[in-house]
């Protein structure tokens, strides 16, 4: 049975400022760096063999810190990027106009093909993160990969594995540097395919991360 660990990046400057990041970027805070170190300490006991990361700066830095602890190389995969939030990226949440808030709500409330102008839909996000996860099945037998990605992207992945719609990710609390695990099983008696073992574990962190509204 293949076990895949899923880690959200550490806290960033824009997380702390309540800015919409999407595929734009901001650096990890000192707290975010510490969170990544704590994931690294935990990961050393998990037998991680591969680290696969989104190619955005905040995930790259998180992956580098974890890789240093695990002694693993990093592969970057753009399919693990965060949802493209279009024209709302870099904006503070509290600064959105009524029209802009309407775009955001369409996206997160499951409106068919809802998207922010110049952004992508939750369905498009779901397709690419599932493709990235499926690539793990091509790794050598006995591999135990760790994927570093983003809040909405990982929430969408876990939700859809559970058979929920992509926009149900808002019902999952995946804090900065939380660890989730999904397993691929083949069984005559149990559900074959991907199953969720754990979601949003933060027991390795000193203190809870920000309860962000935006990732």
Curated annotation (Swiss-Prot):
Disulfide bond annotation, renumbered to this chain: none
Keyword terms of this UniProt record: Glycolysis, Isomerase
GO biological process: glycolytic process
InterPro entries to which the protein is assigned, alphabetical: His_Pase_superF_clade-1, His_PPase_superfam, PG/BPGM_mutase_AS, PGM_Phosphatase, Phosphoglycerate_mutase_GpmB
Associated pathway: Carbohydrate degradation; glycolysis; pyruvate from D-glyceraldehyde 3-phosphate: step 3/5
Residue positions of the active site: 9, 82
Cited Pfam families: His_Phos_1
Catalytic activity: (2R)-2-phosphoglycerate = (2R)-3-phosphoglycerate
Record's keyword annotation contains Thylakoid: no
EC annotation from Swiss-Prot or TrEMBL: 5.4.2.-
Alphabetized SMART domains for the sequence: PGAM
N-terminal signal peptide: none
Domain of life according to the entry: Bacteria
GO CC, alphabetical: cytoplasm
Chain sites annotated for binding substrate: 8-15, 21-22, 58, 60, 82-85, 104-105, 151-152
Name the UniProt record assigns to this protein: Probable phosphoglycerate mutase GpmB
Source organism per UniProt: Salmonella arizonae (strain ATCC BAA-731 / CDC346-86 / RSK2980)
């Amino acid at each position: 049975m293949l076990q895949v660990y899923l880690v959200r990046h550490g806290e960033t400057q824009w997380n702390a400022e309540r800015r919409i990041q999407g595929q734009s970027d901001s650096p990890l805070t000192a707290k975010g760096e510490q969170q990544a170190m704590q994931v690294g300490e935990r990961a050393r006991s998990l037998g991680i063999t591969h680290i696969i990361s989104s190619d955005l700066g905040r995930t790259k830095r998180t992956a580098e810190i974890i890789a240093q602890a695990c002694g693993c190389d990093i592969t970057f995969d753009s399919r693990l990027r965060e949802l493209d939030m279009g024209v709302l990226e870099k904006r503070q949440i509290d600064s959105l106009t009524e029209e802009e808030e309407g775009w955001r709500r369409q996206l997160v409330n499951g409106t068919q093909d809802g998207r922010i102008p110049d952004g992508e839909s939750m369905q498009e996000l779901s397709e690419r993160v599932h493709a990235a996860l499926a690539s793990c099945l091509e790794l050598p037998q006995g591999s135990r990969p760790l994927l570093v990605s983003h809040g909405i992207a990982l929430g969408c992945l876990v939700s859809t594995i559970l058979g929920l719609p992509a926009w149900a990710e808002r019902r999952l609390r995946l804090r900065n540097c939380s660890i989730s695990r999904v397993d691929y099983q083949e069984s005559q008696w149990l559900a074959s395919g991907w199953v969720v073992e754990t979601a949003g574990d933060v027991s390795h962190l000193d203190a809870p991360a920000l309860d962000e509204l935006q990732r």
